Amino acid sequence: MDKIIKSIAQSGAFRAYVLDSTETVALAQEKHNTLSSSTVALGRTLIANQILAANQKGDSKITVKVIGDSSFGHIISVADTKGHVKGYIQNTGVDIKKTATGEVLVGPFMGNGHFVTIIDYGTGNPYTSTTPLITGEIGEDFAYYLTESEQTPSAIGLNVLLDENDKVKVAGGFMVQVLPGASEEEIARYEKRLQEMPAISHLLASKNHVEALLEAIYGDEPYKRLSEEPLSFQCDCSRERFEAALMTLPKADLQAMIDEDKGAEIVCQFCGTKYQFNESDLEALINDKA
């Protein structure tokens, strides 16, 4: 089962989140039938949103949009504070071969664009923030958002490793943030440790990558585990929700679906589930609108 572990240095100088998101990203790949580069780009976005959602309280809903002008198009993810996330990528078929070290390229195929976050607190006034894409690698763009919009300097590592068949082998990441009150000495020590950390891909390849991430982040520094919470890919779409959407259409449009298509098929963008509405279903909707 996927999970996020929240921890804090015993000194109170900084905190860290580490994630195992392997099942989340594997299910996203299965549902959207994404090829290699598209899988990694979507996976990193899902992991970023899992981190962002874990930082919120209450019943907030968090939307992350990575909007680029190159091959991937837009990547959209929605998460809640209960560990659920869903998402999709416009172009599922980007399949750029790995580098000599086995890395899948993402940044060059994201292009120029924006990292957009929308946090809905359920009060009717969602908070929206837009920052430019810095590298298109998702992790660096997420870190820049946290620094610029939330005024919280953060170190971020996100990645998805694929097997020889381009299926998800492991996915996960981390976030480290300096906390108010940290001394200059503590900040310097934290920065030095992060600079000396192995690459995220190397840590994810470890037998127990969650523990490897924690060890790399804290080293010999004592820390406390605050919580361990489950994560999953879960879509909240339903037939009732799409039926309500059909009800917003004019009668003429519903009648056209009956006359021309003998019904309607609606496919959820986030999970690919198909909902069928036959002629009788559409006629009932027309009658309900009368």
UniProtKB/Swiss-Prot annotation:
GO biological process terms, semicolon-separated: protein refolding
GO molecular function: protein folding chaperone; unfolded protein binding
Keyword Disulfide bond: yes
Disulfide pairings: 235-237, 268-271
Pfam families the UniProt entry points to: HSP33
Sections of the chain in a coiled coil: none
GO-annotated cellular components: cytoplasm
Places the protein is found: Cytoplasm
Gene3D superfamilies, per the entry: Hsp33 domain, HSP33 redox switch-like
Main location: cytoplasm
Domain of life: Bacteria
Keyword annotations of the record: Chaperone, Cytoplasm, Disulfide bond, Redox-active center, Zinc
PTM (free text): Under oxidizing conditions two disulfide bonds are formed involving the reactive cysteines. Under reducing conditions zinc is bound to the reactive cysteines and the protein is inactive.
Keyword Transferase listed: no
NCBIfam families: PRK00114.1
Chain's role: Redox regulated molecular chaperone. Protects both thermally unfolding and oxidatively damaged proteins from irreversible aggregation. Plays an important role in the bacterial defense system toward oxidative stress.
Annotated family: Belongs to the HSP33 family.
Name the UniProt record assigns to this protein: 33 kDa chaperonin
Organism this protein belongs to: Streptococcus pyogenes serotype M3 (strain ATCC BAA-595 / MGAS315)
Gene: hslO
